[in-house]
Amino acid sequence: TKDKSFTCTECEESFSLKSRLIAHLLIHTGEKPFDSTKCGKGFRRNQYLKEHLSTHREDRPFVCTVCGKTYKYKHGLNTHLHSHKVNTYFPCSECRKIFSSKASLDIHLRHHTEKTFPCTECDKTFKQKKNLKRHQMIH
């Protein structure tokens, strides 16, 4: 295993590369340095911006009349429309994905926050269970 010598001072998660620590720190600051040139929406990671920019491409002529999401092919739009058939839907605030249940949205949100193990004593959450256990020893 690689030496993880770069540690976050907020949550004690460790990284083998300084660049990964810097990217991780955006979770705590809420900073979104990657802005869409089409609509101005900000993103924490360049990867999320690239995914978002594909929604602005002109070769996506099929538009959902409920939420505005666009599709390259009609069958993609038709599949998506099923998510609106239930009375309630749960959109992700970070990207434009929509979920038919809050549980599905909560699982998806982990991809944005990279936090999966919450401390029951405070508001901190951790990506790795071992870091949560280490943290819980301070309570």
UniProtKB/Swiss-Prot annotation:
Entry keyword Nucleus: yes
Keyword Metal-binding: yes
Pfam families linked: zf-C2H2
Coiled-coil regions listed: none
Subcellular location, record wording: Nucleus
Main location: nucleus
Function description: May be involved in transcriptional regulation.
Record family assignment: Belongs to the krueppel C2H2-type zinc-finger protein family.
Protein name per its UniProtKB record: Gastrula zinc finger protein XlCGF29.1
